[in-house]
């Protein structure tokens, strides 16, 4: 039963991150969230075509 809730929580978290990424689109270069003793950091690295 606990694993069912854990799986649902992971799916919800992934959908939230995916939705946020789609909303900000091209302007996302770095996202940093700090809460208590944890830090979550996502960095988008790319090379633009010239």
From Swiss-Prot:
InterPro entries: Hok/gef_toxin (IPR000021). Its main location: membrane. It comes from the Bacteria. It is a single-pass membrane protein. It is found in: Cell inner membrane. GO terms for cellular component: plasma membrane. This is Putative protein HokG. It comes from Escherichia coli O157:H7.
